[in-house]
């Protein structure tokens, strides 16, 4: 192969010459391509070619048109030698790692090659713009070192392309591919077309840069890594260890891992603040403990490998299962905190059970030991209350007592102030006074009604006429109305038929029939009535007086007799 050796050892092809070479390739019409060689040959080619670097003050004239006797596809090197497009492409491909292919050739639509990744990467079907080629030639990429050499590549029948009329000679071009992975194409992924012919399988590197697999065999490859890129059973090239990150993402290895949830292993702060909600959690804890073995019921698994997979399988070595929070609090061995059992439950007041995870009433498990609630939570009792531990009850709060201030509640959370007490006292006193006032008004009204009725009766009796008084059935004066009473002086005297004496007929008959000595008694009674006339005030006040002021003696006798007999 012809090389430009006119330059010094520290000088390389200028960018202008590379630009001219790219223009010649575009004008050539068809360029054959070969399969990618090994990385060792690419490295040797780069080492064999002179590394030219133009000095800062180097100035060159623009290349003029070729002479009439020279080849159209050749160009003049700085040393004066002619160099064809083959040498230009070889050196530019060795420096920049870019494959110069023609998309418009009849037998080649695009090349699909593996550049050190598990996914197929498509080479650009169209050549890049000249300014892009110029930028890539200025920045030489790092050539990875290959750890294994292979023989010279052999072309395939499908690689041969039709010759072009513009080129005077038909010599194949070597296309060098960078197996270490170059910078991604800024134009994005393009459509790939099947390559005519199969690429020769290239051996992969012996080093697998994966820290998540164990049990590799002596050759440095996993026995069952056929599904991963670069495994022995495939024709894909394995990525180089010193190259960039391969295109297949390492996140695929984490598909079998469960993300860590901190809430599954550590209780929240509400567990310490809202102790009033412990009963519901205690019921769940009781069901979990009383149901038997936790590992059998809830399938609590420790971090172990997959069942049935031994060393050398290339699978993840561990799998985490999230533990429910209700089992981590006081039921799983080694947990940080245990719930306080409900007071009075049988079997829960023991110092510790067989697994040593339960505590007595009023104690909780903290950092592997049972501690008192009063010591663990200094503010368990609110408003200055004192915390005590009572057997079979648990934590008990004794509320603080102050002047005109009282506290109540299980944890002294309620406050009663002096204002509230004053309101209650004043309200009670007002209620009692209201009841007394209502009773006083009620009885006063009753007395007033009685007094008013008596006054009306007195006024009515004062203005009554004598005729109304004589007709009154309750008046004793009706008997002695204006005539002598028909009262016999003696029992043997005949009766008179006077109608005025009918009222005394009954008494007359009684006296005369019952007692034979009745006449003598009647006489004595009449005498006594005359003597004691002044003592009968009631009879005198109720008896009518005659207009002349003279009362009949007989009437007085009758009245006296009537009073004594009755």
UniProtKB/Swiss-Prot annotation:
Cytoplasmic side: 445-566
GO molecular function: growth factor activity
Modification after translation (UniProt): N-glycosylated. O-glycosylated; contains chondroitin sulfate glycans. Part-time proteoglycan, expressed in part as a proteoglycan exhibiting chondroitin sulfate glycans and in part as a non-proteoglycan form. The relative amount of both forms depends on tissues and tissue maturation.
Segments crossing the lipid bilayer: 424-444
Pfam families: Chon_Sulph_att (PF06566), Neural_ProG_Cyt (PF06567)
Topology within the bilayer: Single-pass type I membrane protein
One GO term (biological process): positive regulation of substrate adhesion-dependent cell spreading
Domain EGF-like: 371-413
InterPro entries: CSPG5_S_attach_dom, Neural_ProG_Cyt
Sorted UniProt keywords: Cell membrane, Developmental protein, Differentiation, Disulfide bond, EGF-like domain, Endoplasmic reticulum, Glycoprotein, Golgi apparatus, Growth regulation, Membrane, Neurogenesis, Phosphoprotein, Proteoglycan, Secreted, Signal, Synapse, Transmembrane, Transmembrane helix
Chain residue ranges for the region called Disordered: 39-82, 143-202, 215-248, 262-354
Entry-annotated residues carrying Phosphoserine: 467, 475, 483, 543
Sugar-modified residues: 38, 57, 117, 165
Extracellular topological domain residue ranges: 31-423
Region (Interaction with TNC and TNR): 264-301
Keyword Endoplasmic reticulum appears in the UniProt entry: yes
Assembly description: Binds TNR and probably TNC. Interacts with ERBB3 and GOPC. Interacts with MDK; this interaction is independent of the presence of chondroitin sulfate chains and promotes elongation of oligodendroglial precursor-like cells.
Other remarks in the entry: Different forms of various molecular weight have been observed. Such forms are possibly due to different levels of glycosylation, phosphorylation and/or protein cleavage.
Task performed by this protein: May function as a growth and differentiation factor involved in neuritogenesis. May induce ERBB3 activation.
The name this protein goes by in its record: Chondroitin sulfate proteoglycan 5
Species name: Homo sapiens
